[in-house]
Amino acid sequence: MTTKRTFQPKKRHKERVHGFMKRMNTKNGRKVLARRRAKGRKVLSA
């Protein structure tokens, strides 16, 4: 058996785990967004 690729991308999973709403739900998530805004990131979350 060969080893399979461990990254099997799924859009729904990506957005549920790393999305904007998930970030806004927790205090630390909001800190992440604030840091990324301060840095001037074009994209804040997945």
UniProtKB/Swiss-Prot annotation:
It holds the Pfam family Ribosomal_L34. GO terms for molecular function: structural constituent of ribosome. Belongs to the bacterial ribosomal protein bL34 family. Keywords: Ribonucleoprotein, Ribosomal protein. InterPro entries: Ribosomal_bL34, Ribosomal_bL34_CS. This is Large ribosomal subunit protein bL34. GO terms for cellular component: ribonucleoprotein complex; ribosome. The gene is rpmH. It comes from the Bacteria. Signal peptide: none annotated.
